[in-house]
């Protein structure tokens, strides 16, 4: 009975729970890889064997964190759990397809780990650029396994996206019009469209790479009239929307958390927030070549991509200032989720500012492939996406589990994490400005100080992971009953009679839900 409940589940809450647990495990593995990277870089000299094994770990770390930690938790976990509850739907539109979306992920993960383990591993970086990923430079099955892994993960995401889009369009309760949709629902809605439009391009690119490697096509081989730059265009046409896919659901969760703990019914400027999400989604498809400023594009092309990239800062700024306006004049409840949300706004803004620096094509030619870029995207991912995940987790954990986290220890967890990630990534700005390149396992002695500081920070973050495990164990072992929120939130998920809401949310289809707005 239990086995069939979890293997053949058609229940959005069970599938969401599976996603959350899988994402937590993948996050542990990805974190372990990051600690290996930072241990190698803690001192000059070689710790592992050579740059190939180092780059295999870097590649696996990136792909694990993106495809098996952030996306399954944000879209699969929070999306499945919350969206039906927030729109008053009994479940997702296609419950069995929902189950398949999840069960494509573990085999994909196994293929990725296999790609790191066979031959000499996939030491290409997560971008898998040819000719480094060609049959010549990476002979053997490694890259092929990584390609198949991405195919499965992509298929899973496309199926999930179809499911979310259909659910949100067709299964809203009466009275839940699009201009009343909670912001988290909006953010996943836009994210699903981004996935639907970008993943097929990646699938095409990696399929062409697969045939280049195995059946002598020359899509990316100049010897046969191909062009390796074509792969970069195809990859980044997926890769840039992907980074917005990683952060948009986080934006949605942060909007809910800030409005809730500020005691507001809704975030400031709801409609502006919605248009900002949509604008970010559209603009995300128009800026991909800012990842390629160093490959020799025309000056007018570079000028366009510089300008377009800077325009994305406008809707992002609308969101940041709307969050701050939501906080304005409120009597804040300093619960843990709010700390994560405030940390998110501050650190994501810093990451956004370094992004504006890198948008300048002339500056980027100097900073491209240095640790400055690493610092930039870890500020928006490791302190943006991950902080949003923890804000959402600490906020909705009582709803999901029926027990509450320890109020003091969860704040300690936040404090240790905050110190750890900042100590890890802030010094990397200095290393990048001083010219330390990415994807090398060793460096001149001049870079020792900040690398050592950075590695100490990663050790602190590792301790933070153990505190988190303790937090979850402590919550389930003491079984403190959560109290209902003192004030009702503008979203529906808190309005159900029990924590967690019953296995089947409704015994019969609800006729109407009246929202105060």
From Swiss-Prot:
One of the record's GO cellular component terms: respiratory chain complex IV
Keywords: Calcium, Copper, Electron transport, Heme, Iron, Magnesium, Membrane, Metal-binding, Mitochondrion, Mitochondrion inner membrane, Respiratory chain, Translocase, Transmembrane, Transmembrane helix, Transport
Source domain of life: Eukaryota
Residues engaged in binding Cu cation: 240, 290-291
Sequence positions that bind O2: 244
Reaction equations catalysed: 4 Fe(II)-[cytochrome c] + O2 + 8 H(+)(in) = 4 Fe(III)-[cytochrome c] + 2 H2O + 4 H(+)(out)
Cofactor remark from the record: Binds 2 heme A groups non-covalently per subunit. Binds a copper B center.
Membrane topology field: Multi-pass membrane protein
Needed co-factor(s): heme; Cu cation
SUPFAM superfamilies named among the record's database cross-references: Cytochrome c oxidase subunit I-like
Cell location: Mitochondrion inner membrane
Membrane-spanning segments: 17-37, 63-83, 100-120, 145-165, 183-203, 234-254, 268-288, 305-325, 338-358, 380-400, 414-434, 456-476
Listed GO MF terms: cytochrome-c oxidase activity; heme binding; metal ion binding
Residues involved in heme a3 binding: 376
Cross-link (1'-histidyl-3'-tyrosine (His-Tyr)): 240-244
Binding site residues for Mg(2+): 368-369
Amino-acid positions noted as binding Fe(II)-heme a in the UniProt annotation, renumbered to this chain: 61, 378
Binding residue positions for Ca(2+): 40, 45
Predominant localisation class: mitochondrion
Pathway as given in its UniProt record: Energy metabolism; oxidative phosphorylation
Keyword check for Repressor: no
GO biological process: electron transport coupled proton transport; mitochondrial electron transport, cytochrome c to oxygen
Similarity comment: Belongs to the heme-copper respiratory oxidase family.
Subunit composition and interactions: Component of the cytochrome c oxidase (complex IV, CIV), a multisubunit enzyme composed of a catalytic core of 3 subunits and several supernumerary subunits. The complex exists as a monomer or a dimer and forms supercomplexes (SCs) in the inner mitochondrial membrane with ubiquinol-cytochrome c oxidoreductase (cytochrome b-c1 complex, complex III, CIII).
PANTHER family membership: CYTOCHROME C OXIDASE SUBUNIT 1
Protein name from the UniProt record: Cytochrome c oxidase subunit 1
Gene source species: Pisaster ochraceus (Ochre sea star)
């Amino acid at each position: 009975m239990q086995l069939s409940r979890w293997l053949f589940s058609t229940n959005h809450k069970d599938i969401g729970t599976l996603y959350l647990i899988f994402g937590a495990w993948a996050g542990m593995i990805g974190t372990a890889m990051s600690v290996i990277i930072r241990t190698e870089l803690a001192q000059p000299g070689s710790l592992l064997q050579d740059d190939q094994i180092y780059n295999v770990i870097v590649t696996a770390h990136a792909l694990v964190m993106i495809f098996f930690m952030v996306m399954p938790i944000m879209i699969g976990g929070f999306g499945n759990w919350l969206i039906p509850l927030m729109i008053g739907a009994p479940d997702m539109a296609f419950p069995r397809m929902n189950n398949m979306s999840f069960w494509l992920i573990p085999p994909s993960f196994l293929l990725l780990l296999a790609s790191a383990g066979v031959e000499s591993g996939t030491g290409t970086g997560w971008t898998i650029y040819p000719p480094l990923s060609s049959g010549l430079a990476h002979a053997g099955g490694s890259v092929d396994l990584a390609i198949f892994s991405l195919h499965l993960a992509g298929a899973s995401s496309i199926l999930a996206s179809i499911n979310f889009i259909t659910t949100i369009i067709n299964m809203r309760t009466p009275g839940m019009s699009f201009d009343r949709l909670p912001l988290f629902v909006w953010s996943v809605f836009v994210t699903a469209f981004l996935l639907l439009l970008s993943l097929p391009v990646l699938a095409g690119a990696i399929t062409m790479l697969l045939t280049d490697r195995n059946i002598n096509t020359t899509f990316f081989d100049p010897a046969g009239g191909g062009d390796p730059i074509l792969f970069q265009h195809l990859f980044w046409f997926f890769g840039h929307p992907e980074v917005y896919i990683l952060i948009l659901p986080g934006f949605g969760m942060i909007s809910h958390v800030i409005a809730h703990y500020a005691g507001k019914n809704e975030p400031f400027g709801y409609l502006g927030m919605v248009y900002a999400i949509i604008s970010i989604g559209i603009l995300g498809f128009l800026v991909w070549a800012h990842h390629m400023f160093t490959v020799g594009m025309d000056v007018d092309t570079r000028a366009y991509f510089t300008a377009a990239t800077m325009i994305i800062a406008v809707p992002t700024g609308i969101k940041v200032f709307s969050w701050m306006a939501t906080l304005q004049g409120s009597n804040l409840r300093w619960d843990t989720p709010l700390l994560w949300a405030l940390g998110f706004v501050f650190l994501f803004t810093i990451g956004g500012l370094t992004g504006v620096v890198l948008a300048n094509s002339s500056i980027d030619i100097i900073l491209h492939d240095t640790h400055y870029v690493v610092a930039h995207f870890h500020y928006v991912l490791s302190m943006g996406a991950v902080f949003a995940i923890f804000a959402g987790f600490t906020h909705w954990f009582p709803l999901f589990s029926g027990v509450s986290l320890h109020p003091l220890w969860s704040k300690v967890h936040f404090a240790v994490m905050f110190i750890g990630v900042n100590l890890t990534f802030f010094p990397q700005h200095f290393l990048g400005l001083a010219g330390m390149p990415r994807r090398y396992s060793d460096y001149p002695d001049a870079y020792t100080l900040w690398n050592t500081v950075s590695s100490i920070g990663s050790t602190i973050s590792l301790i933070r992971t153990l505190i988190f495990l303790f937090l979850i164990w402590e919550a389930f072992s003491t079984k403190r009953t959560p109290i209902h929120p003192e004030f009702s939130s503008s979203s529906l998920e808190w309005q159900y009679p029990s924590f967690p809401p019953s296995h089947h949310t409704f015994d019969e289809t609800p006729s109407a839900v009246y929202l105060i707005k």
